[in-house]
Amino acid sequence: HLCGQPCEMDKIHALGQEYGFAIIEDASHAIGGKYKGNPIGNCEYSDITVFSFHPVKIVTTAEGGVVTTNSKELAAKLDLLRSHGITRDSSLMQNDSHGGWYYEQVDLGFNYRMTEMQAALGVSQMSRLHDFVAKRNALAARYDELLKGLPLVTPCQIEDSYSGRHLYVIRLKINEITITHKECFDQLRERGIGVNLHYIPVHTQPYYKELGLVFTQLDEAESYYQDAISIPLFHAMTEAQQDEVIKVIKEVLV
């Protein structure tokens, strides 16, 4: 769900049914979003959904995240893996218990446990999630309106969806402007606008190149990389701050 915009999960689910693959939703950007009226993370169309609570996300626990699933079997497996693959559940053990202290490592897990302090930080923000996302959507709608007529494309929102609006990404119409993508990015940064580029296509990274992937292999991802710019969007953003972003974009592009 890139940038918070829900994918067309019914179509992805249909493909999963046809070809027999599991579906894991990456909802790192999409907390607070909805698809066909239901919250992202209810796993109606997937096996697992993962959320990130990294510091830059809409809700943060400083680090960590959450996994949701409707499968008791997957939930039990996740519970095991999050704590070194260690269990005190006798039904999962291979040997008889030696006593009240006994445990067994039955799988190769890791320490994925969030601390209670981190969890408390996250819980304290959940009551405000609706307001956070509503404010981001209002700011995004204002961007949509005030950026009209400029040589760029604003984000789409598919029918029957409600975006978490983690990011607001514009795509430059390169053939309609006199500067390059990089020049536009640099000029916005020089003028104090905190733009970024989310993200570099993963198949162009050195690790994946070693697997045989090459830069000209995924045209849409590469086209996106060559014209996308993320502009500032945060729930505490004021209209005056947003107006400044828009003013500078106009000055750079027109």
Predicted features by range, described:
Residues 1-61, 66-74, 230, 234:
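Active-site phosphate-binding strand-loop segment of PLP-dependent enzymes
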Residues 5-12, 18, 34, 72-254:
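PLP-dependent aminotransferase class I/II
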